[in-house]
Amino acid sequence: MPAIVLIGAQWGDEGKGKATDLLGEQAQWVVRYQGGNNAGHTVVLPDGQDFALHLIPSGILTPGVTNVIGNGVVVDPGVLLDELAGLEARDIDTNRLLISADAHLIMPYHVAIDRVTERYLGKKQIGTTGRGIGPCYQDKIARVGVRVQDVLDEKILRQKVEAALDIKNQILVKVYNRRGLDVDEVVDTVLGQAEKFAGRIADTKLLINQALDRGETVLLEGSQGTLLDVDHGTYPFVTSSNPTSGGACAGSGIGPTRINGVVGILKAYTTRVGAGPFPTELTDDAGENLRKAGGEFGVTTGRSRRTGWFDAVIARYATRVNGITDYFLTKLDVLTGLQTIPVCVAYDVDGERVTEMPMTQTGVHHAVPVYEELPGWWEDVSGARSFEELPANAQAYVKRLEELSGARISAIGVGPGRDQTIVRHTMA
């Protein structure tokens, strides 16, 4: 059986939690392969319970599924324990959660540096969540990071923390005029936290490959979205990892020939959190109405999301760079009640019409959307469970987005509930 990649096709917050929850019903394994607790997703169960998850894969809510925090993820031990405690308090079985020994740990000094750096940048800030994600990935690339397996050997952990604080404290004290961190305090804190998750540490790369050899289905869950990818996103307003499908192999430890399909998640309109270019952004009442109707506030930060119309240029780009085979279109219900719905089909960049993503950062910043107006609908779509039950104009809207995006739309979300989904085709 296959490995299936699930990836956001916009700037994150597309509704990946619901898609993972749906696909997780046919998977035996759900693997988070990059990012950290800088992104969140909400899953609503049939009984009305909603769960906000930031680090743990949303497959944790499906009985019998083994969940993995992969080697490409950066793990804040405190957040991990808080999330586990929150799930267990609501009688969710967390015994089937494993953590890669090769994942990196977000240390207290990563969070401290992330927060003071953003404050120092002021209006020039990138808009990070201040969770220490970027500084942790910096240490990983510089080969001075602390890995999950290091908590199993206090001597190695202490050596790494001492070496790190020799430099980090210089930055905190001399550059930002902040108090330095104490080695013993950091080590003791992390070791104390590790006592509560050490039994979950495993060679997950081996276990995932063995599962595939047995014919089991593995769902590889990315966080954030394509346009936030450090290589393929709107750099420098991006995250520090590769949420695109190519990152799934590196972040989980499986080879590319294991992947059978790539499912992209598209919101029926577009949102973005933080700074950076956003060609279809609405700064008027229409944008505020979308924000309120869609509940567009970040799960992790609570920040208001920027809103705009659907952008087919970035959808086509996401299809190409991810090799997307199927799309899950979310929040179609939010557009109910609009007379017409603009869809961006191209950009005007300094007088030239382009239908593909501009090559340069300047080009993206100069992009002015070229819209096609589609007729809206007034009927309530939240109860539809087949494509044919949707209003004719809603069907036409979906078909047009499918045509513009370059991959079939196989599932459609018509509400926040787990059951409020239309499945048109079997995905992957």
Swiss-Prot record:
Substrate binds at V299, T300, T301, G302, R303, S304, R305. Its cofactor is Mg(2+). Its EC number is 6.3.4.4. The keyword Membrane does not apply. Gene3D superfamilies: Adenylosuccinate Synthetase, subunit A, domain 1, Adenylosuccinate Synthetase, subunit A, domain 2, Adenylosuccinate Synthetase, subunit A, domain 3. GO terms for molecular function: adenylosuccinate synthase activity; GTP binding; magnesium ion binding. InterPro entries: Adenylosuccin_syn_GTP-bd, Adenylosuccin_syn_Lys_AS, Adenylosuccinate_synth_dom1, Adenylosuccinate_synth_dom2, Adenylosuccinate_synth_dom3, Adenylosuccinate_synthetase, P-loop_NTPase. Keywords: Cytoplasm, GTP-binding, Ligase, Magnesium, Metal-binding, Nucleotide-binding, Purine biosynthesis. IMP binds at D13, E14, G15, K16, N38, A39, G40, H41, T129, R143, Q224, T239, R303. Binds 1 Mg(2+) ion per subunit. GO terms for biological process: 'de novo' AMP biosynthetic process; IMP metabolic process. It is an enzyme of class 6 (ligase). It is found in: Cytoplasm. Belongs to the adenylosuccinate synthetase family. This is Adenylosuccinate synthetase. The lineage of its organism: Bacteria, Bacillati, Actinomycetota, Actinomycetes, Pseudonocardiales.
